[in-house]
UniProtKB/Swiss-Prot annotation:
Pfam families: GlutR_dimer, GlutR_N, Shikimate_DH. It comes from Clavibacter sepedonicus. The keyword Oxidoreductase applies. It catalyses: (S)-4-amino-5-oxopentanoate + tRNA(Glu) + NADP(+) = L-glutamyl-tRNA(Glu) + NADPH + H(+). Substrate binds at residues 46-49, 111, 116-118, 122. This is Glutamyl-tRNA reductase. The gene is hemA. Keywords: NADP, Oxidoreductase, Porphyrin biosynthesis.
Length: 439
């Protein structure tokens, strides 16, 4: 059973999202350690989203409620947000709704800047992180891999991502009126994570040629070399700030790396009274809001940038939604087929075991030949093929439980029924998207 707890710019404040992002690294591992019924967990944390995807294998009726409560407890403990506030900040999606939601997220349909391309890479890295941490599962692997495939389909078959939309490009759009000449603008890039490359590319597309990079974690040289830009050491940070007209921060540091005293120091070093624009793309925030108390400093943070998100392209969005819906339907069908697989395997194994037993008795009587055995095996394969195909068809129609019941009743086979095939009594959950409902 797949479950997703999601908090985003749609239903949570940036203050809450900032605290949740701090909790992200530890949530999946803690959930797995503390709850045997959770088979897998993947956490996706971006600049406007925190989501926990769970694979719950416990067949109990209350499994969904237990998984939600366990996740809320872990997130509350890791983030410092009161439990009730965490509960009030997340939507819960179960079953079929999970796939459609993630496919839409990975395609950029749920982003602040609809169609932005960075989210696909963030979804991919979330799965890679779960693999590294040993918290993924077969079900989550398929879910996230299908999400990546769906995102690629949206990118190639619609115009949704053709404009190169992203938060950093939107931020630079907003900065346009403050920049007289991009080619003469000196920029300090703070951070070397996944978003740093996109930020550098966006700056270069504007014509920026003077970019230095500083890393709070000391990885500036590693980033600077391949990208052909100078690295800034910690001891030279104030000097680099002083020489900059614009600062773009995209670090994954858990606390602010720039504050008012840094900007005051930079102003003192430069001594020219220049204006500086600081663009903070970090979550949690990389820049203390108190920088605006320094004369000449202007701050664009994620919350401000989000207020200026462009209207979506309705035609491209509708086309993308159609692709997502189709992919989600196919994912549901494939998952349903998997649910009857044990019954189909048990049936085929039973019938072929019976055949082998009969052939063995015939051999002992000396009445067998290679041609006869080959013909009988072919006949049994033909006879088993139709029920196998029909079982998958019924599963796609939501009749998987009937298939399992029939195999057990007619052949006396003990088929272990996967939890996902069962039909437990619905458990009341707050703000929940049940299977089959729109995400």
């Amino acid at each position: 059973m797949l479950i997703c707890l999601t908090a985003s710019h749609h239903n949570a404040s940036f203050e809450v999202l900032e605290k949740l992002s701090v909790a992200a690294p530890s949530v999946a591992g803690t959930l797995m350690e503390q709850n045997d019924f959770i088979a897998g967990a993947v956490v996706l944390a971006t600049c406007n989203r925190f989501e926990a995807y769970l694979d719950v294998e416990e067949p109990l009726t209350a499994a969904r409620a237990l998984a939600v409560e366990a996740t809320v407890d872990v997130v509350s403990g890791a983030s410092g947000i009161a439990r009730d506030d965490v509960r009030g900040s997340v939507d819960v999606k179960c079953g079929d709704a999970v796939a459609e939601h993630l496919f839409a997220v990975s395609s950029g349909l749920e982003s602040v800047v609809v169609g932005e391309g960075e989210i696909a890479g963030q979804v991919r890295r979330a799965l890679e992180g779960a693999r590294t941490g040993g918290t993924t599962s077969t079900g989550l692997e398929r879910l996230f891999q299908t999400a990546s495939n769906t995102s690629r389909g949206v990118k190639t078959r619609t115009g949704l991502q053709s404009a190169g939309r992203s938060m950093v490009r939107l931020a630079l759009d907003l900065a346009e009126s403050r920049i007289a000449d991009w080619s003469a603008t000196r920029v300090l890039l703070v951070g070397t994570g996944a978003y740093a490359g996109a930020s550098l590319a966006a700056l270069r597309d504007r014509g920026v040629v003077d970019v230095h990079v500083y890393s709070p974690s000391g990885r500036a040289q590693k980033f600077a070399g391949p990208h052909g830009i100078p690295a800034v050491e910690g001891r030279d940070l104030l000097k680099a700030l002083a020489a900059s007209d614009m600062v773009v921060t995209c670090s994954t540091a858990p606390t602010a790396v720039l504050a008012a005293h840094h900007m005051q120091g930079a102003a003192a070093v430069s001594g020219d009274g220049r204006r500086r624009l600081v663009i903070d793309l970090g979550l949690p925030r990389n820049v203390d809001p108190d920088v605006v108390t320094v004369e000449g400093v202007e701050l664009l943070d994620l919350e401000t940038i989000s207020l200026h998100a462009p209207l979506r392209d309705l035609t491209a969005t509708d086309d993308a939604r159609e692709i997502v819906s189709t992919a989600a339907a196919e994912f549901r069908a494939a998952s349903a087929e998997d649910e009857v697989a044990p019954a189909v395997v048990a049936l085929r194994t039973h019938i072929f075991d019976v055949l082998e037993g009969e052939l063995e008795r015939v051999r002992k009587r000396g009445d067998s030949s290679e041609a006869t055995e080959k013909a009988l095996r072919h006949l049994v394969s033909v006879l088993v093929h139709k029920p196998s195909v029909r079982a998958r068809e019924l599963a796609r129609q939501g009749e998987g439980a009937r298939v399992v019941d029939a195999v057990q009743a007619l052949f006396g086979l003990d088929v272990e029924m996967p939890a996902a095939v069962s039909s437990p009594v619905a458990v009341a959950l707050p703000r929940t998207a049940e299977a089959g409902q729109a995400s």
